[in-house]
Each structure stands twice: as structure tokens, then as C-alpha cells.
């Protein structure tokens, strides 16, 4: 008996490997805690929030550090300017404090 297509005319398909190579499973659970935090964030926020993006970045960094993912620059993984966004949000929260200080210093300057 013969198995397969009639006449052996199966088309030859070539598979290309993924662009970044394989993505091995985390058998030892080295990055599971970060992955669970990320999945919970996505479940709760239901959007691509900055907080969830930072967890995704942390997860990929964990995989790189443990050898489960090839080392690469975060910019190549789609994390463009995230550090700036974080520092901008921090500086904008500090702006309220700075504005009160700058207005008091303006008053001192105006009084002199």
C-alpha cells in the first residue's frame, strides 16, 4: 500500500526560519513571573498601555539575560523612545513641584 498523494506529486514547499530564529520554551520558568505580570496587565488594561509595554520589555530582557532569546538592542525590538516617555512622565509629575518653586523664585526676582 502506498500513502500520500496519487503519483507522488506533492508540491515541494520550503519553509523559511523565523527572522529572529527560534523562540525556545522557558522550561525552568526563569522568566515566568514577568510573563504573568505582563499577561495580567494586558488582561486588566485591555490596551497597549505604557505600563504593559515596559513589562514586555522587561520580559524580553529577562529572556535575553537567561539565553532564551538572542541578545539585541531594544530599538530593534520595537521599543523606540520608551525610556524618554518614562522620563517625560516623571518630569511632568515633577513639573508641578518645579512650577511652585519657580513661581516663588519669580516672586523673589520680581521683588528685588
UniProtKB/Swiss-Prot annotation:
Looking at the record, the residues that make up the CHCH domain are 28-70
Q: Where in the cell is it found?
A: Cytoplasm; Mitochondrion intermembrane space
Question: Which Cys pairs are S-S linked?
Answer: 31-62, 41-52
Segments of skewed composition (Basic and acidic residues): 73-83
Does the keyword Iron belong to this entry?
Answer: no
Predominant subcellular localization, coarse grouping = cytoplasm
One cellular component (GO) term of this entry: mitochondrial intermembrane space
Motif Cx9C motif 2: list the residue ranges: 52-62
Q: What keywords are assigned to this protein?
A: Cytoplasm, Disulfide bond, Mitochondrion, Transit peptide
The annotated regions of Low complexity compositional bias extend over 84-112
Tell me yes or no: is NAD among this UniProt entry's keywords: no
What are the recorded Gene Ontology BP terms?
mitochondrial cytochrome c oxidase assembly
Q: Where is this motif: Cx9C motif 1?
A: 31-41
Q: Where is the transit peptide?
A: 1-16
- TM region(s), chain numbering: none
Identify the stretch(es) annotated as Disordered. Answer: 1-24, 73-112
Q: Give the GO molecular function terms.
A: copper ion binding
The protein's role, per its UniProt record = Required for the assembly of mitochondrial cytochrome c oxidase.
Q: Which family does it belong to?
A: Belongs to the COX19 family.
- The name under which this protein is listed is Cytochrome c oxidase assembly protein cox19, mitochondrial
| Source species | Schizosaccharomyces pombe (strain 972 / ATCC 24843) (Fission yeast)
Tell me the gene name.
Answer: cox19
Amino acid at each position: 500500500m502506498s500513502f500520500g498523494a496519487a503519483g507522488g506529486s506533492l508540491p515541494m514547499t520550503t519553509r523559511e526560519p523565523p527572522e529572529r530564529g527560534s523562540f525556545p520554551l522557558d522550561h525552568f520558568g526563569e522568566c515566568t513571573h514577568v510573563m504573568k505580570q505582563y499577561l495580567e496587565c494586558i488582561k486588566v488594561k485591555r490596551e497597549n498601555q505604557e505600563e504593559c509595554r515596559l513589562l514586555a520589555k522587561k520580559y524580553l530582557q529577562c529572556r535575553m539575560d537567561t539565553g532564551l532569546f538572542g541578545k539585541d538592542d531594544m530599538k530593534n525590538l520595537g521599543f523606540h523612545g520608551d525610556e524618554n516617555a518614562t522620563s517625560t512622565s516623571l518630569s511632568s509629575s515633577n513639573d508641578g513641584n518645579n512650577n511652585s518653586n519657580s513661581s516663588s523664585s519669580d516672586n523673589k526676582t520680581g521683588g528685588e
